Amino acid sequence: MSNYAPFIKPYVEYNEHGWGPCEVPELDVPYQPFCKSDRLGKICDWTAMVPEKKFPSKYASTFGNNSQYAYFYEDDDSTFHLVDTTGSKATKPYQRGRYRTNMRNNVRTRGRTGRGTPNIASLGGSTAGGATASTTKYGKGRHTRNTQNVGRRFGRNAPTRIRESSVMVQSNWVSIEEIDFPRLLKLALPNIKEGKDIATCGSLEFYDKLYDRVNLRNEKPLQKMARVVHTVTTTDDPVIRRLSRTMGNVFATDEILSTIMCCTRSNYSWDVVVEKLGTKVFLDKRYNDQFDLLTVNETSVEPPMEEEGSINSAHSLAMEATLINHNFSQQVLRIGDQEQRFMFEEPNPFEEPGVDLASIGYRYRQWDLGNDVVLIARCKHNAVIQGPNGDMQFLSIKALNEWDSKVTNSVEWRQKLDTQRGAVLASELRNNACKLARWTVEAVLAGSDQLKLGYVSRMNPRDHLRHVILGTQQFKPQEFATQINLNMDNSWGVLRCLIDLVMKQPDGKYLIMKDPNKPMIRLYDVPENAFDSDRDEEESSEPLSNSNDN
């Protein structure tokens, strides 16, 4: 006799004529209609339940309350009758705790007892949904309701916007590293000294101080300047090619460096091509890329939508902001053959015969980042001005543009720019935090003495071709970096982290990309011919300039 329990083989039904069980024993089971939100209030119906006075339908089912819409099949036409469409008041189901207010801290309730709460607005606070409360003479609260956020529930918010990547990731690309923004924000590389000039090229025109007097009562129209700006990448720069033979091991431009150093403030996707040749690393941008376009309202709560044919789409606004920035930086200069120019040691390396180039001075600077990492970058100035002591001060000139304050829910410049310029700048810092941080980093890298910001707005919100200059403002780059909470030690740390990561890899081509929908930086190993098609398209294109229709 075995000590174990006997194993009884179960009976398994086999259906030879179809799927499922062979027999269905439970047929004609009555169905009781119910609602999942009904509250269970009793277990057994031993005695009749005493209804409550306040909530008589506390345990009633909410299924089929509107019986006038129920369908009953009958052949007798005598039951046909007209339905009263005036509507019937449906019995509200009982729901525990729904929209129950805090009776203890209710201003209206406590006001009747003479012990009203203090004015919430005077303490700097506000009620939920943006409603403010105040106390009247007799203690009864008076509420100003803002129904924008009232009744918002979980899952009813606006859907998350899915952004597109700046470059399509191919299947043969190898993912090497993923670094999220919280890790990057903890990095720091302190005690980086000021960059040392190793070459200066080009010439600069002087800034016209008359534009410092521009205000809302004396606005100036923005002109279209027919000047060419060459946006040459790192490996195509002849000066960087010459310097790379004898000095440095990391080479880049100020636009590429500012993009990497301010990556933790970016929301849109971008990418930087990295080429490693022995001990040298070249940071490049892709050919025919949108890298040089300025973003608009990138860090806003509601950034611009991508709508084809709309002047307020993200791409159209980026093109508009780029042209505004180019035109403004050249219009505020003292232009003319008789005007004085500041000449650097070497001529413009991108000068072409018969082409009117924009006023840009290039400074090739060198930084020691430690651990035998020597960075050489091309930086630029837009203008020069004579200081109070007779010394020359270099300027970085940028322009902020307003397109439609009603759509963006921001401060209207034509009402607040002269009286509350700080509020206007704070609104721009909130909506364009990444762009302003990049401009500040570029000015710091170039060693500019001043960062000149211009406020340019559309003449009409529906016309994206005509603009006016409403005012200007200037800052010292280092002080402005402190005001916008830009930590240069952290920016240098982020750059050094990515450089060290590339230095550990074998020779080849890599891609640093900002994830379009996550706060994360990705590093890919890409083939050598990954972007050759973009290079062919770029060689057939022209440098950035103003056309007649822009």
Swiss-Prot record:
<keyword id="KW-0648">Protein biosynthesis</keyword>
<feature type="region of interest" description="Disordered">
    <location>
        <begin position="108"/>
        <end position="152"/>
    </location>
</feature>
<feature type="region of interest" description="RNA gate">
    <location>
        <begin position="290"/>
        <end position="304"/>
    </location>
</feature>
<dbReference type="GO" id="GO:0098808">
    <property type="term" value="F:mRNA cap binding"/>
</dbReference>
<dbReference type="GO" id="GO:0001732">
    <property type="term" value="P:formation of cytoplasmic translation initiation complex"/>
</dbReference>
<keyword id="KW-0396">Initiation factor</keyword>
<keyword id="KW-0963">Cytoplasm</keyword>
<dbReference type="InterPro" id="IPR007783">
    <property type="entry name" value="eIF3d"/>
</dbReference>
<protein>
    <recommendedName>
        <fullName>Eukaryotic translation initiation factor 3 subunit D-2</fullName>
    </recommendedName>
</protein>
<dbReference type="GO" id="GO:0016282">
    <property type="term" value="C:eukaryotic 43S preinitiation complex"/>
</dbReference>
<keyword id="KW-0694">RNA-binding</keyword>
<dbReference type="GO" id="GO:0005852">
    <property type="term" value="C:eukaryotic translation initiation factor 3 complex"/>
</dbReference>
<dbReference type="GO" id="GO:0002191">
    <property type="term" value="P:cap-dependent translational initiation"/>
</dbReference>
<dbReference type="GO" id="GO:0033290">
    <property type="term" value="C:eukaryotic 48S preinitiation complex"/>
</dbReference>
<feature type="region of interest" description="Disordered">
    <location>
        <begin position="527"/>
        <end position="550"/>
    </location>
</feature>
<feature type="compositionally biased region" description="Low complexity">
    <location>
        <begin position="115"/>
        <end position="136"/>
    </location>
</feature>
<comment type="similarity">
    <text>Belongs to the eIF-3 subunit D family.</text>
</comment>
<comment type="subunit">
    <text>Component of the eukaryotic translation initiation factor 3 (eIF-3) complex. The eIF-3 complex interacts with pix.</text>
</comment>
<dbReference type="GO" id="GO:0006446">
    <property type="term" value="P:regulation of translational initiation"/>
</dbReference>
<comment type="function">
    <text>mRNA cap-binding component of the eukaryotic translation initiation factor 3 (eIF-3) complex, which is involved in protein synthesis of a specialized repertoire of mRNAs and, together with other initiation factors, stimulates binding of mRNA and methionyl-tRNAi to the 40S ribosome. The eIF-3 complex specifically targets and initiates translation of a subset of mRNAs involved in cell proliferation. In the eIF-3 complex, eif3d specifically recognizes and binds the 7-methylguanosine cap of a subset of mRNAs.</text>
</comment>
<dbReference type="Pfam" id="PF05091">
    <property type="entry name" value="eIF-3_zeta"/>
</dbReference>
<dbReference type="GO" id="GO:0003743">
    <property type="term" value="F:translation initiation factor activity"/>
</dbReference>
